Amino acid sequence: MSPEMGELTQTRLQKIWIPHSSGSSRLQRRRGSSIPQFTNSPTMVIMVGLPARGKTYISTKLTRYLNWIGTPTKVFNLGQYRREAVSYKNYEFFLPDNMEALQIRKQCALAALKDVHNYLSHEEGHVAVFDATNTTRERRSLILQFAKEHGYKVFFIESICNDPGIIAENIRQVKLGSPDYIDCDREKVLEDFLKRIECYEVNYQPLDEELDSHLSYIKIFDVGTRYMVNRVQDHIQSRTVYYLMNIHVTPRSIYLCRHGESELNIRGRIGGDSGLSVRGKQYAYALANFIQSQGISSLKVWTSHMKRTIQTAEALGVPYEQWKALNEIDAGVCEEMTYEEIQEHYPEEFALRDQDKYRYRYPKGESYEDLVQRLEPVIMELERQENVLVICHQAVMRCLLAYFLDKSSDELPYLKCPLHTVLKLTPVAYGCKVESIYLNVEAVNTHREKPENVDITREPEEALDTVPAHY
């Protein structure tokens, strides 16, 4: 066998074949060389911008979104590394001539980059969000060199804001509660933080259209009033841009609820397209009274194409919009069956679903993973809107709730979304405030916990142990 046809080694994460390392590749490994960058290489998303420009807000939301669509993503917040290294006293730590502090900050950046490498190359991560100011060309060059050496793609997100009102609101909402300012006087916090911003302004070098024309980036001006996008390289970067151009910070609430109890719910049958039960109709009117009591301005109402959500919305007496994407998960051959019937006719399928409920796909039907992909346009539109009431179904509501509450794929299929209960979601600084409102109309329980025994050879009694009661 010729040297050129030597052993091939598959890289576990990139799923591609590269020549096995040998003595002849010494030149390729010399200092300053880089790993080849492939189409599906891991990506580093690098935040850029002065303090109080919403970088951590963007990092958190983007990470939540990418994880939800199935792209393993993690935030590396440099402020946390700095707080672990040294306790914060005041803005003087960030003075450009504080050489001791500069060295500490650089060491923190290197420690964070080491963790980024471990995550992307050894923990099966695909996107690392490097959340820091990264305001100098020197710091960005350090990151670019690091990415080149490890074969990572780089995408910059720069948040630029010159509106004093927006900056002040960001400081009020986020920085006053920062670990740097625990138990500090409000006015002193504001004064110190504004001086910290001034320290960064001295050496701030924004991404430049000419000098950085070879880089991939998006510049966001004044919380989304204007955008500049340059050299988007791949699918992940294009989805990132699309997502960032849809989010906003306008105060609003999203109301999630299921349809009223249906005739098939009462009988313990999944799926189907039945109408509301007597109690389901009572709930529809209770929902109308609740929504009216909230005094919500410009409320939009969305339903699926299914009879039970439409009947629930009709009681509101307001215009509503039907989304096919909001239809319940397709149970395929198991549509309109009870869990007992599924266990009787398809015991192996029933066990396989219990083993991996998120990825299991019903024969001729869908999985929760499929449902998440179907619901992505709904999430995008929810991010664009202000006040919305979504009347949907159990599996659909679980997927939407998992997005807003940052739940993993293992947790998602078991989130509790009871009938006749409204969840009010109000976005806050780095997450979502949840209020659960039960509207005092009884309904059957449709929630089935994961049974202890998920083996295919289990007894029927073990398989049906967590099935809720029904008529």
From Swiss-Prot:
The modification Phosphoserine is found at S33, S141. Disulfide bonds: none annotated. One of its GO terms (molecular function) is identical protein binding. The record marks H393 as: Transition state stabilizer. One of its GO terms (cellular component) is cytosol. Homodimer. This is 6-phosphofructo-2-kinase/fructose-2,6-bisphosphatase 1. It comes from Homo sapiens. The gene is PFKFB1.
